[in-house]
Amino acid sequence: MNKTTSQEILKTNNCLEWLFEKIFKQLVPNKQELYDLPFSEIYSRTFCNSQIHQLIAESLKSTVIEIETYLTDKKFIEKFLFVSVRREYKFRIKKLHVQIMLKEYDKIEFLINSGYKVDFDSLKLACLNGSLDILNLLLKFYQKKLSSELLMYCSEFSHYDIYQLLTTKYNLYPNLSVFYRAVLSDSIEIVEDVSSNISANQQVMENAFKTNHTDIINLLLIRAKKDGTHIDRNLVVYPIMNCNFELLTILSNMNLIDWHVELYYSALLSGSMEMITYLEDKIDKINPDFHKKKILDSSHQSSGKNSLLLEDIIYEIDGKKYFSHTMNYAIQSGSVNVVDYIWSRGYGITVSNFITAIKQGSVEILERLCKWYHLKLPIYLIHYFSTKSYVTNKIAKAKVLIENKLLMINEPVQECIELYKKEETHIKLIEQPTQIVSDSKYDPDYLMQYSMFFIPMKGFKLNHRLITQIRINLQLNYMDSLVELYTRDRNYADKMILLNNLFLFGTIDQIKILYPLLKTKYCPDKPILMEIICKCEITKLCYLKNNRLLDNDVVQSLIPLVIMLENPLINALFSKLTTVNLIDKYIVLSNNVTLIRKWLNESPVIDKNQIKSLFLLDDTKITDSILSKYSVTICKHKEEFLDWCQEEDLLDTRQKIEKKYLK
């Protein structure tokens, strides 16, 4: 973490913080993760993530180093966790917990001495984060009986020193739940201790095989054999996928492998030609010529399966139909060499393989498929590049398909009922709520929630295809196609799609050329305008202003956001459009400490709820200013403020109120 305060390089930047809050909530959708994972994992995923720095820098036309310095500053992180997280998640994260996450020993000691109570979550966080010195400090002030649950957290993340302390000095004993977590670690010392008293069951063994720590798995296998515990032979898929030949040898010597042709799928997922060759040697002995016979692609159609989707996965050789499973597994391996090899063995390619490559493959793999496939792809594949489809390198992949003339997004389409049904089926599949794979979480469409900007207009069906078609053309700057698309006659809903897309994804040069083609004086929807303001896209705002597209009602509706962001450039622009009168409640909501301090110097009239909101900023100067200037209000409601401060974990503020008003 950066110890230089962010204010030395950038003053409080509400635009940056607004963007980061939105992104943080997408990357940490469940607040409980803050209490279930070491903070180092949250930190590397969010505050110290180069992809996030790059995205925000591009959005704000800033430099990556400025964004990185701002987000990795300890002072900012501390404020973000205590102030922003509780606001965004409606969740009270305690001040003591924040300092434990940040491993600030001196601050923790100060807070405890100031009256902050050590609870079970405090101990849990110290165990998760591997802070032995902090745990020792906390244990001095923890009055309740300790629970073996603490062993789960230090075991899972390999903190053997903490495990030793809790089992020896505090006599905590591991149970089966601890065993489940221990085998997820790389600490053989912890696993050895736990397994000496508890027999491994099937779940324990599977957890261990997933982590691929050979020494730990071997230890468990030996003890399982000694205890007579059944070992599932299907566990062999893990060492195959993890390319662990040493573990395969151990399993083979223990006669725990039944070789069969379906294991070849796992070999493909390993991405290793060495493992693929190894499996081929084993399978050929029991199933000669399995490649030539296409055994892996000879699945039978399951009853009740959607025939619309089945058509996308079928290919034909010598009059016989096959299902392109093998190529799909090869694509999921992420290895171009594996994809090349499977193609060389005579396996077919289908539309399904292109969908898999878009979702889980690389640009290079997609280029390979284009080289071998010579049919036009159905237009409904365009939806896998929509704002609701979260994939990596989305626009680069679209470019590959378009420039290889396989996906003709700008050619007229012969509409029919069958195409409509297929298109609707794929849209529903894409929009199904599923767990997003790790890499896809960094798709800007996911992080920035762009799909929220396109909702059906009353009386119209949302034109999904048009939204994605325009967006791709804008981002690839296909101006000839764009000019043609923007000059067509459209209904009102589709015109708004063109307009909103243009201002959300287009450049100012594209706007200057394309907006006049719409032959309208429409203004983008308010959410689009708010996004433009938050990203400080001044040139777009100037275009709207100069073309008189921002009427007074629209401008007035945007003033609260302008006040909250407190950006000098945006303020200057809006001051030319209207008189920006600072509205008290929006100044408070801005959380901009500099603006609020300046505002408080004018001694505005504020009520007790606004005082509470300002206390939540946890800024010493603001707190002291309020206590000095609003003594009548605070004194009148002092009991309420004292209880509220206790509830909100603002004990230092509570102590100041007690000292000043309870003499």
From Swiss-Prot:
Keyword NADP: no
Domain of life according to the entry: Viruses
Keywords on record: ANK repeat, Repeat
Segments annotated as ANK repeats: 91-118, 119-148, 200-229, 258-288, 322-351
Coiled-coil features, chain-numbered ranges: none
InterPro entries tied to this protein: Ankyrin_rpt-contain_sf, SecEffector_AnkRepeat
Keyword Repeat applies: yes
Protein name stated in the entry: Putative ankyrin repeat protein R219
Organism of origin: Acanthamoeba polyphaga mimivirus (APMV)
